[in-house]
């Protein structure tokens, strides 16, 4: 039996990171049966931005994509990314909707649900975790990894224990920004293995150039499964190359058991797609390199490009360094939220406003106000009451689970689209 499991991300996070989730089903359908024979721990193939992208940009049915992958890959576990109470959207949804979406995901072929919350607020995961357990799915609860004064090993061990107690079958260290360092990873994994009994999976983006070393030190510390991407869509803002990690571990006590020759067939299939994406501009060579700003400013690569875009639209591109210096200040003011969807957009946009208007918090976005008021959940650090008053004014402050304020939504949506749909998913 393989010592280290490998989750292949090419069908979801690899192309989400490199080409804005634009890979079409008919582009990868032809290789699925061969991928099913590789022996991966799992195929990450659904959730995250794929659902939105199928509907908004690709004119595809995301449910039919999932059913097709399930038919072609009967022997491999299929995995999705699920944003807890946010599901696959950008706001909190009612419990009945979350429960039903989880049920339908499992019914249509998902085996493993990687469930995370942007604020690491376990309350925002409980409904999704309970639903996945109820309908027979494997719950992989994810820690949104970030850096800052409160984010020490003790913080992560405490959160991991909360996740295990909530019902997690495994735990993923989700390093969405490529902020993990090799030796920091070793210490973190060692501590987590002493704290929880469930398997640990490691997910780290190559943005800062450290992810392969992070994987290796994580494995030495006891990680059970790693996320990789087949080489044509690896590296840069994606993940370490599958073949490289398999070769690095071959013949050691950590041998993955995967066949490099078999992986060559997978690589050869995706190579022409890479060339096509480069030729049509979908794959920008800039995202394939190392972005040292990630290490310097602790800002995820995707967030950095978004900040540049906002400044360009305002004709204030020369203000980038000021905005990058403002981000950690805004993050501190708002309770140190990890910078991942949707909090990265919320903090980033507010930082841009603070700089280009010449006065901090002269204008406050609705989303920033809601986050400070508690409508996204509890922030990792307490927010100063005077700052909260300044931002929120007379708006109601909440400390309950945000979804507790939401009425059931499922029947309302059913009624709204009753005349249009043939089946519910």
Predicted segment positions?
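Hydrophobic faces of well-ordered beta-strands that scaffold small-molecule active sites
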Residues: 6-11, 41-45, 76-84, 111-114, ...
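Non-catalytic positions within long, well-ordered alpha-helices that form the structural scaffold/packing
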Residues: 36, 106, 164-167, 219
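N-terminal amphipathic alpha-helix/helix-capping segment at the start of soluble metabolic enzymes
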Residues: 1-19, 66, 71
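Terminal or standalone catalytic/regulatory effector modules within metabolic enzymes
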Residues: 36-54, 284-294, 298-425
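Active-site beta->alpha loop and helix N-cap motifs at the rims of alpha/beta catalytic domains
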Residues: 47-164, 171, 181-182
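C-terminal helical cap(s) of enzyme catalytic domains, especially alpha/beta-barrels
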Residues: 234-256
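Catalytic cores of alpha/beta
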Residues: 151-163, 208-224
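Glycine-rich phosphate-binding active-site loops on the catalytic face of alpha/beta enzymes
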Residues: 115-118, 175, 221-238
